[in-house]
Each structure stands twice: as structure tokens, then as C-alpha cells.
Amino acid sequence: MQQQPEEMRMTVVDATKFGAVGDGKTDSTNAINECLAWTKSMGYNTVWIPNGTYLIDGTKNSDPRAPFRGAGINVPGNIEILMDAETVIKVKPNSSWGYAAFYIGGTSNVKISGGSIIGERDEHTYTPAPRPTHEWGFGICIEGASNVVIEHVRIADFTGDGIIISNGGDGYKPSKRIKVTDCEIRRSRRNNLSITGCDNVLVEGCEIADAGTGNGTAPRFGIDIEGYSEGNIVYEEPVNVIIRNNVLKGNVNNAISNFNGTSVIIEGNIADGTISYGYGTSTTIANNIIKKNPESTGQSIGINGLGVGALEARSDAVIKGNLISGFTTGIDIRGKSVFATGNQIRDFVNAGILAYQASQIFIEGNNIENDVPEQRSGTALSITQSDNVTFSGNQIANVVLAVRSTGNDVQIKDNVIKQFSRGIWISQGNAVIEGNFISPAGFQTVPESYAVSVTNTASAVIRKNTFTRFRNFPIYCSTNEHTKIIGNDIEDSPLIVTLYLTRGTHEIIGNTITLGRPSLPAILIYLDQSSNSAILDNTLRSNTAARVTAIQTNTSRQTLIIGNTVVKGMIHSHETDTVHGNIEV
């Protein structure tokens, strides 16, 4: 009696019935391919490979120009391959620069689940010609296919990539709707997983380990999302990729690299190496735990970017909710239009966040702190060769330097900055420093320096900040440019000189400064070698029995000193100054 369509779908074809032998000695390539071809020809959908070790010729039936293409087990469309948990597909040792254990090319509706697929990298003969890297030996090669699922498979020891997902066929035919779930992929010489020409790929719940170890070949990434273009022509482009809830460890270089993909989401992963948005566009890196392996020296950055792609106008990267610890630099931001928010960065050496050759950068609501006393070093935020950077609502603690900027159009607003040696240092470019709570609070690792300093050729607006528990200048300016110091609250100064400004032109307006120092000498505002500055409407209080020097400008020229309220203090001005309307109590 003829089988009905539902019965046909339920039929499971046993590969051993076609001569496949799981003894680890017999070449079963032809037998498994014959089984797959017969299954498809009969309208069945499922092939079963039982427990055993099946030897496969990964170069069989290959394209001489690309020996991985069409090679090994060639999987037709509308087929599901089920393997026992103890099944092993083992590639025979060879000397080819390319091969494949499973090839899925130009077909649709394929599923491979269970078992192990093992390469021959340790038995391989690495001939010097024609391609000496031998980086094209693949566990599963997917080219121009669609609706493919790889699940619960262990893949290891390939000369190239464990899995590669790319375009194929005539013209440009990307692979579409590919899922790799709950797999273990390890010890590939090149990348454990490469994603090149595709649209809609999901990698979820996998363990990705030890890519590029030993005699590995570049780039040695856990997961590499990388297309290819020349000039204005794009030959391969990865788009709509999700890398979610995976564990990545021991990969020689990046754990995950989006070199130039578009619309990539990297979320919920646990990694001991770098996650990179590269030159990619519209990358989201969210809610990952990235903790450096202390035994690894090759990867020094938790999350990084490389810049804007040659054919793109912006990066449009979002970095949010990640926990990053133990790296030299926590986050290295490059490119244009990057938003970093809600990240926790711990135990870095050089910089918590670095913005380098970056523009339109928003860094908000992050917690940057060194917890271990011997690692309380480095800079929480470093801005170099960058512009249009906003740093707001962040918390910084236990660092040598809180913020160092040489950028232009920098906004440093509403941050809480505590326990540091040097606070905010603007040494080039221009910045607005507004609404911050700044308290060195007895930082122990190195001596305390300035809370806010503006030096060299920089200019700054320092407005509505609160300074407390400091032992060195809360504000120090030695720039030749213009600064505005407006509406700040400087509490209980213990210093001989509280505000020290030399050279340049300064507007010191509406600040409140209280002196906590019990004895003389004391100067609250000292303006030195400046000209055409203004000291207006400030409130200056001393708690000493004797009057202190509230304002000293006798080594500057043409200063306006107007409308200040001075409690237990006096003004020492220069003969060229205008002194008017001040109240001395």
C-alpha cells in the first residue's frame, strides 16, 4: 500500500542500511550520501546515523577550485539528519587546503542534530602550496542555503572553521534563516564560527571555545561576522545576526567580532575575551558578562570598535548593561554615533572607557570602578582625537584619574566622581563640566592632585559642580585660553590656596567657597598673571578668627572685582583692577 504524505514524513531511514559502518575504519562517505539521495528521492525527510564512529572523506566530490564546495557529506534540501549522542563523524586525514565534513549548498529546509563532527587538524598534512594556511577545512559549510538548523552538535578540530555560513550560487545568494543552537564548537584553527554572506542568523546557547590555539591561523576568533568588499562593490554582507546566551572561552583573539556586519545583536553571552563591533553598522552589545581570563595575555579590551566602515556614514552602536572586568581597557569606543549606557566596568589598568577617533558619543549611566587596591590605577574615561562626546550620569570611584580629555565639544555632566588622585583634566580642546559631585575623599594609592584642571591650550566652562573632601586645588587653571567658573559650591577648603588660576582670561561668577582651614595663611581665589578677567557675585566665607585673603589679583591686570560677598576676608587687587560693590563682613 502506498504511504501517505504524513507517514512519509514520519519515516526514519537508517544510514547503516546503505553500508555506513561506525567502526572508525571504514570510509562511509558514499554510503551516507547514497542514503541521503535515496531518502530525498523517495520523498522521505529523516535520516538516522546510529552510535558509532563513521570515517568521512572531506575532499570527496569537491570542486577543484574550492575543495570544500560540494565535498564530504552533501546534504540535499528537505532533509533532517539525526545522530545519536555518541555518534562521531570523523574526517579522514588529508593534505587538502580545503574540505568539508558536511556541505549544505543552495538548498532549503535542512536540519542536523546530535552527535559529534570531528576534524583532523592534528593529523593533517600542511603542504606549502597552493595555499599554505589550509584555513578552508570546515566542519559544516553552508553556502547560499536557507532554513537550516544545526542543534545539539559537537564540532571540533578543523583546519579552518567549525561552521561557516556564507553566500553561494550564481550571482549573490546569501544564506538565510540559519540557526545554530545548543552546540559545542571548539579547537578550530581559524574561527569556530564564521558568518559572512547571510541574512537572518541566530547563534544561541552554544559553547564556543579554544579557536586558533596551537598552530592556529588568523584571525582566531570564537565567532567572526565578516563580509567582503572591494572599493564600492560588496561581495559578501552579513545582516540581521543574533548571537545570544552563548559561553565563549579560551579563543585566542576576539570572543565575538562583528567586523563589518549590519544589524547585529550580541546579548546575554558569557565571554573571557573581546567582543567587538568593529566597522559594523547598527550593532547592539547588551547584557554580556565579559571577564578576562587572567592566564590569557592576548586580549586586552573588553568591548571595542574599529571605526566607521568605508561604505557607511555611521557606526550606530549601542553598548548597554554589560559587566566587564579585568581588562587593560574596559570599552574602546571608535567610530561615529555610539551609545554606551548602564555598563559596569571593574579592575581595568589603563582606561575604563576610551573614546578614540570618535564622534557623536554618548556615555551615560555607567559605573566605573577599580575594586582591588593594587589595581586602582588608570583613567576612568579618556577622550582623545574625538569630538561631540557626552559623559553624563556616570559613577566613578577608586581611580588615579577620573576623566582626561583632549577632545572638542565635550560635555561632562551630572556625574558622581569619588576617591581619585586627579579628577577631571582638560588639556586640549574644549569642555563643559557641569553638575558633577566631585570628592577625592582620601584616595590612598597615589597622592591627591587637582579635582578639576584646565591646562595647555584647553578652554572650559566649569558650572554648578559640588566639590568636597579635597586636599589639593578643587579648580586649577593654567591655560592661555578662556575659562568660565560659574555657580560652583566648594565646601570646607583646608587649603592655603583654594582656587588657583594663572594666565588666560577667566570669568569667576556666582560661586560659593567656604574655608574650613582653622588658621592663616589662606587665599580663597588667587588669580595670577591673568588679564581682563572677571570675579563677580561670589560668596566667600572664612571661619577663622582673623581675616583671610578672599581674593588676590595683585599679580594680574585689569580684573573686574564686582558684587562679591566676603565674610571674614579682604581683597588684594592690582592698581589696574576695577573693584566695586563688594560687601566685606
Q: Where are the model-predicted features located?
A:
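Right-handed parallel beta-helix
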Residues: S95, Y99, T107-G227
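Leucine-rich solenoid repeat scaffolds
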Residues: T549-V585
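Acidic Gly/Asp/Thr-rich repetitive segments characteristic of extracellular carbohydrate-active
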Residues: A15-P50
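Extracellular beta-strand solenoid repeats
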Residues: W48, L55, N74, L82, ...
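Short glycine/acidic-rich loop motifs that flank beta-strands on beta-rich extracellular proteins
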Residues: G58-T59, V91-A100, R121-T127, F138, ...
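Extracellular beta-strand-rich solenoid/capping regions of secreted or surface-exposed proteins
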Residues: N33-M42, L55-E80, K90-S113, D122-N147, ...
